[in-house]
Amino acid sequence: MNRLMILVFAAVFLALASADEDVDIAKRGIPCLCVSDGPSTRGNNLSGIMWMKTGGYGGNGCPKGWHFCGKSRGFFSDCCKR
């Protein structure tokens, strides 16, 4: 079970870390709650995309053309929006 969890985490990490190379960048990744979406997820769309913090990104953890839109910064990832 632990191996499966590590494998799934590694696959998600690699998919999100390489997502900025894709043309359909907004369709890939994990949706997250932006401040503009409202106070809760109930009845609201999640308009942000979770980005893994990797080298080469700006100080906000988002790729070029995207901005930080979350309430607080994560340790491994940030919620970004185009």
UniProtKB/Swiss-Prot annotation:
<comment type="similarity">
    <text>Belongs to the sea anemone sodium channel inhibitory toxin family. Type I subfamily.</text>
</comment>
<keyword id="KW-0738">Voltage-gated sodium channel impairing toxin</keyword>
<dbReference type="GO" id="GO:0005576">
    <property type="term" value="C:extracellular region"/>
</dbReference>
<keyword id="KW-0964">Secreted</keyword>
<feature type="disulfide bond">
    <location>
        <begin position="62"/>
        <end position="80"/>
    </location>
</feature>
<feature type="disulfide bond">
    <location>
        <begin position="32"/>
        <end position="79"/>
    </location>
</feature>
<dbReference type="InterPro" id="IPR023355">
    <property type="entry name" value="Myo_ane_neurotoxin_sf"/>
</dbReference>
<dbReference type="Pfam" id="PF00706">
    <property type="entry name" value="Toxin_4"/>
</dbReference>
<keyword id="KW-0800">Toxin</keyword>
<keyword id="KW-0872">Ion channel impairing toxin</keyword>
<dbReference type="GO" id="GO:0017080">
    <property type="term" value="F:sodium channel regulator activity"/>
</dbReference>
<protein>
    <recommendedName>
        <fullName>Delta-actitoxin-Aeq2c</fullName>
    </recommendedName>
</protein>
<dbReference type="GO" id="GO:0090729">
    <property type="term" value="F:toxin activity"/>
</dbReference>
<comment type="function">
    <text>Binds specifically to voltage-gated sodium channels (Nav), thereby delaying their inactivation during signal transduction. Causes death to crabs.</text>
</comment>
<keyword id="KW-0732">Signal</keyword>
<dbReference type="GO" id="GO:0042151">
    <property type="term" value="C:nematocyst"/>
</dbReference>
<feature type="disulfide bond">
    <location>
        <begin position="34"/>
        <end position="69"/>
    </location>
</feature>
<keyword id="KW-0166">Nematocyst</keyword>
<feature type="propeptide">
    <location>
        <begin position="20"/>
        <end position="26"/>
    </location>
</feature>
<keyword id="KW-0165">Cleavage on pair of basic residues</keyword>
<keyword id="KW-0528">Neurotoxin</keyword>
<feature type="signal peptide">
    <location>
        <begin position="1"/>
        <end position="19"/>
    </location>
</feature>
<keyword id="KW-1015">Disulfide bond</keyword>
